[in-house]
Amino acid sequence: MKSLKSFLIWGIVVLVGLASFTTLALSRGEQVSAIWMVTAAISVYCIAYRFYSLYIANRVMQLDPNRLTPAERHNDGLDYVPTHKGVLFGHHFAAIAGAGPLVGPVLAAQMGYLPGTLWIIFGVVFAGAVQDMMVLFVSMRRDGKSLGDIVKQELGTVPGVIASIGILMIMVIIMAVLALIVVKALVHSPWGTFTIAATMPIALFMGIYTRYIRPGKIGEISIVGFILLMLAVIYGEDVAHSSFGHWFDLDGIQLTWAIMIYGFVASVLPVWLLLTPRDYLSTFLKIGTIAALALGIVIVNPTLQMPAVTHFIDGSGPVFSGALFPFLFITIACGAVSGFHALISSGTTPKMVENETHVRMIGYGGMIMESFVAIMALAAAASLDPGVYFAMNSPAALIGTDANTAAEVITTKLNFSVDAATLLHTAKEVGENTILSRAGGAPTLAVGMAHIMSRLIPGEAMMAFWYHFALLFEALFILTAVDAGTRVARFMIQDLGSIFYKPFGNTDSIPANLVATFFAVALWGYFLYTGVTDPLGGINSLWPLFGIANQMLAGVALIMCTVVLVKMKRDRYVWVTLVPAFGVLFVTCYAGLQKLFHSDPRISFLAHAGKYRDALASGEVLAPAKDIGEMSQIIFNDQINAGLTALFLAVVVIVAVYGFRTAMKARKVGWPTAKEIPAVYRDGKQPEAQHEA
């Protein structure tokens, strides 16, 4: 009876999913509700988590609840701290969910809602969530070692050192882009800056409360923390208009220094004091807002106004250059698969897992949650008037700086009808002077969310409130990835430094921690500063590099996981990581080669640098540069971006070659050769027998 009931329930879920995808894919010309995107995603997520993640946990990984985790064995109260799975899920989700799932899908909406929807949903099931879960498992079995250290341990010293250097540089770019999105959202926004600043003392209070005042009382401090957070959000507007509001009214360079200082402090304090409670606190706002947006989509039932597929799949779009293949995949980035997650899954999280069986919920479940965020972002963007969408995301050099010119260009050149009155009215609704050329994706998502939420909770000026609340939400969403990422970068630098000076790798050494943290913050802080001062706006230069770096890192992580499975003598399951590894690497390497060698200056870093170099030689100044100095800066930035792309490609090729060689050697040996830490079992218990999924 129970099996019949289960069969019927899952049969209904499958039918709902099929109906949703059929409606999304086959509707042409008629109006399509955004609800179909939500139901399609939820159906696939439920099926994947119930069956595929269980298959991986029980058969591929063979998780053992009686095996002590690194957090239990070391428990130093600093980095290794056994943490309740609900709290750790919040920390992990807050750490991995950065700019990618919010910004990438919004930019990808240029090509229509269907390509992005398909990649976000199926990419996460078979690649993104698999990577997160597998890397977390592999790292835990090696005392929470970093990705670079695991590559060195399992593939050899040479590929390990090369991978560690490449991974660190990839991490630096990712951190810089995440921080840049925050800066763009908070520039001269005292309301948002105050609210985010307020989360820090609130988090310190929560950490001290659960550590010393009421240990283990997660429920009650969660309620207190949530109330304090809501008060900070609500009264942030009053603070912004008060006599000391100017303290929080910062420009881009001031915010850059503030974020760098915060990243340094957060990385050296014990995780229980600031990092974990702050991320847990941020998760309330993150999940709550996304849940409210999903509820708003269901109740308001907005129509997807963007076509399923637009004519910009040929690469001629104004938002980002390049054809659907391969640039859609690197643009969406974290919404489907993210190499950054591999750094968190081999950084802070494996040192805090309370029981090995929690890997499934935290690793696979956390990534599914992020993918759902990406679907919500895509739905919000696709429900906007396409004319408004392209007005917000097209460069000023194309559409101009006034509403009349923009409306004419969008209607005649981009073939999406919009009038100047609509653009002016939208700007007035959200309390802005203009919405033209608000690139980066975050403002577009904020307008989309505001349109939906203001219809869910109507009232005078609610559109402006929800717009600014959404910008705040996005900044808080992203900043939590910056603090965790800085700590991970610290671990990576210490791992690298220990090759030359072994005591430097001691994470208990305060001087070593401080020096490594300084270098980590200085590296990503440099690229953040160049992004803030970039004549092209920073996002335009760094986002493509971010996408390529992020996906290449995912490929490296999946190669490592594949080699580990071979060395564990689980060859029959190697397809679980090998297939997504091949797919991710093929797409990303192809994109990387185009960014280097394509002849179109809109696509290639080198071609773009050549165009500006030729103009500079003839004494010409090309927009958006205003003088010769900015022309030289653009050329230098293009050359740096091209050099980093070449470095990332070289790292991936080297790791792939060594991975293949290592796997072939391991297959010839008749016993497992994976270098796990010897198992220690809870209360003298023996390993638990594994069950089929």
Task: Label every PLM stretch briefly.
Residues 1-15, 47-102, 283, 323, ...:
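Membrane-interface "cap" regions at the ends of multi-pass membrane proteins
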Residues 18-31, 100-102, 114, 172-188, ...:
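Transmembrane helix-loop junctions in multi-pass membrane proteins
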Residues 22-28, 33, 79-142, 153-157, ...:
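Membrane-interface helix-loop-helix modules in multi-pass membrane proteins
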Residues 31-50, 54, 108-138, 148, ...:
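Extracellular loop-to-transmembrane helix junctions
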Residues 35-43, 47, 53-60, 166, ...:
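Membrane-interface loop-to-helix entry segments
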Residues 53-81, 107, 117, 121, ...:
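Flexible loop linkers connecting adjacent transmembrane helices
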Residues 154-172, 365-372, 439-441, 459-470, ...:
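Loop-to-transmembrane helix boundary motifs in multi-pass membrane proteins
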Residues 297-313, 368-448, 484, 529-534:
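Extracellular/periplasmic helix-exit of transmembrane alpha-helices
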